[in-house]
Structures are given as C-alpha cells and as structure tokens.
C-alpha cells in the first residue's frame, strides 16, 4: 500500500488548459483594436509568446500586501504581453488591450478542464488522500478554479506570488508541505514540466510524476514515472 498521504498538482497544463491557444486569444482581442489577422502574424505571435514567457523572471515579488501582490502580478504579465507585441508589432491603445486580455484570463472562459480531471480528483479524495496545488500561476488561479468547479476539491493552494518562491525552488514545495503538516516522504507532486515539477519536487524531497498528455509512448527517462492521463495516477500511487 502506498505511504503517500498528500498529492500535489501543477495547475495549467496538468489539470486544465487554454481553450485554443494563447496566441489566437491575444490576436482575437487585438483585432478589436485594429490589428489585422494574417496567418503569418498568428505564427509570429505563437513564437513570440513562447520566447517572452521563457525570458520572463520568476513571478516572485518582494511585497506582502495582497493588493500590492496583485499589482505586481499584473505588471509581470504586462511586461510579458508587451514583450510579445514588441516582437511582432506594437499598436495603439495597448494598455486598454492588455487590461482586456488580463481580465479575460482571470475567469474560466478561456480555460477548459481535461476530461479526466474532476473524476480522478474526486476519486482520490474518496480514497482519503489530501490534495493540493503548487503552481507558478498568479492569484487569478483561485477564480479560475472556482469557475471550473474544482476549487473545493483541494485542501490547499500554493502559488508563487504568495509563497515568495517559484517552482522549481524547493521553498515553495516545503511551504505547501507545511500547510499539511507532512514530511516530503508523505507526498508526491504531479506536473507537466520536467524542470519545474519533477526536478523541483525531487530537490525538495518529494516524489514526482510527470504527466505528458501529448505523448503516446511515454518518457525516455526511465527514472521518471510518466503518465499520459490522470486516470493512470491511482495505479501508479500504489507502487510508490
């Protein structure tokens, strides 16, 4: 029988995903401000977002006041989105455009759960596991989870801006463990990033499971437990 008592999950890319693509949503909003859609622009936006997001610093801020944290989160994303459009072509009224996009991603409209998410989470709760989220998402995550109808399935939610640490730093994992009064050996973390989720969790002493939803053959790294759907998780837990 598994000794695991608490299961942590990454959020976006693990439990839910963007409907369509970020680039398509950015472009749809930009059309309201006079930007003309072309296939080349859509491709350029996809590449620009990938680079801008990868180049962004960790979303960790030296403030503690909730209002200041939200302000910093918004500025962090402003820099990312500005960087995207700086690469492909800026347009007038960008500040208004950014407000529209940022607020739109703050609810469930542009997010969709993976089909296996709610059933697996409820099943794990019924088996007695404690569930938590460890994510580099910002504080909009709470509203997204409520909108998707799964917020009440989690005992804790730990995000980087409130934890003052971002994955893969061990600190954010330890803070999440402390909320459950658990030791690292009692926990497993499930996520879609080798660096942030697997390496980060292991450095903090947790076991880790990589979810590769787009993969059909699994991971080439035999020392990493890999699943393609959350439905495979319960059987894997029994072996941990």
Language-model features, listed with the residues they occupy:
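N-terminal helical cap/lid subdomain that shapes the substrate entry/recognition surface
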Residues: 2-119, 126-127
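Asp-based, Mg2+/Mn2+-dependent phosphohydrolase catalytic module
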Residues: 1-7, 17, 36, 40-43, ...
